[in-house]
């Protein structure tokens, strides 16, 4: 299984002004892609080549000699979650109770 960069559910400029199109493109298209490229290179011709991302993370976490695999697989998973959590126009209004608590601690 070759791991690949996920398609975003929004355009590169959709997160501006919080994240510019240039920043998003660099982070998604270059930074995240590097983790995927490294991961695919690490697992090529190994027993992990046909595993899901979660299986690779689980298996590589058990062996210190597979730290490179673990790091790149974990960063790929983290970035997948990051992109899913982002959305145009933010997440809307923070619930008032949470907003009050956050203001107390800032």
Residue ranges and their predicted role:
Residues 5, 17-22:
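Short domain-edge segments at the starts or junctions of modular domains/repeats
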Residues 5, 32, 76:
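Divalent metal-coordination and catalytic microenvironments
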Residues 55-58:
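Secondary-structure boundary elements
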Residues 21-43:
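Active-site nucleophile-adjacent alpha helix/oxyanion-hole segment immediately C-terminal to the catalytic cysteine
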Residues 36-50, 61-98:
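Conserved alpha-helical segments that form or flank metal/cofactor-binding pockets of metalloenzymes
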Residues 1-11:
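Acidic, low-complexity proline/glycine-rich segments
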Residues 13-15:
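Secretory/endomembrane lumenal or extracellular ectodomains immediately following the signal peptide
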Residues 104-106:
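Conserved small/polar residues in nucleotide/adenosyl-binding loops
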């Amino acid at each position: 299984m070759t791991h690949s960069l996920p398609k975003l559910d929004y355009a590169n400029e959709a997160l501006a002004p919080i994240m510019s199109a240039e920043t998003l493109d660099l982070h998604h298209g270059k930074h995240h892609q590097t983790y995927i490229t490294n991961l695919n290179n690490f697992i090529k011709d190994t027993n992990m080549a046909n595993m899901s991302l979660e299986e690779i993370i689980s298996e590589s976490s058990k062996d210190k000699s597979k730290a490179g695999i673990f790091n790149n697989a974990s960063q790929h998973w983290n970035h997948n979650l990051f992109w899913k959590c982002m959305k145009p126009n933010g997440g809307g209004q923070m619930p008032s109770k949470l907003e009050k608590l956050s203001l107390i601690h800032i």
